[in-house]
Amino acid sequence: MAFLLHQARFFTTVNHLRDLPPTVQPEIAFAGRSNAGKSTAINVLCNQKRLAFASKTPGRTQHINYFSVGPAAEPVAHLVDLPGYGYAEVPGAAKAHWEQLLSSYLQTRPQLCGMILMMDARRPLTELDRRMIEWFAPTGKPIHSLLTKCDKLTRQESINALRATQKSLDAYRDAGYAGKLTVQLFSALKRTGLDDAHALIESWLRPAAADEDHAAVAE
């Protein structure tokens, strides 16, 4: 099966809101704590080894990185890799800059159609993960959570983590969050959940094409 995400390439790096590209294509943001496996997951989803840089130093990635998706001449969408958060040794000024950059981008970018929130399956929904959800909540746009590194858990532990996270997300819905809140298990190493993640992300990027595919299957 050919995936749209496999046609991804580096587009630009942004350090300030004023530098966001004046593009019109839909965007999907990828967010997560430092060491949640965000860069590795992006690389696996896009079937590339070094598309997103996975730093060995937590908190090193301090910019918003854009990747275009689709034909090089006419990209159809952008993947947006947000700075990892939660690393204690990052200076206070840098943390403040990241928070302003992240919250403003998530709340005001009209091209943004959804957020993929990466959380370590062993430690889901930390305080900072919840803050990301709460920043994004006013938009009413969907959030899909990937519980990464689930290969480090037993099957029963994975099931328990998935159920507990879904229950916590349901509480946001009960409190009035308008957007869809979904979650799945994911392992870049074992490729667990890869097809499900592909299908969901591509349905956000090109819903018309996804509807056509579903209609064709139904026939």
UniProtKB/Swiss-Prot annotation:
SUPFAM superfamilies: P-loop containing nucleoside triphosphate hydrolases. GTP binds at residues 32-39, 59-63, 81-84, 148-151, 185-188. One of its GO terms (cellular component) is cytosol. Residues 24-207 form the EngB-type G domain. CDD domains: YihA_EngB (cd01876). Necessary for normal cell division and for the maintenance of normal septation. This is Probable GTP-binding protein EngB. It comes from Burkholderia thailandensis (strain ATCC 700388 / DSM 13276 / CCUG 48851 / CIP 106301 / E264).
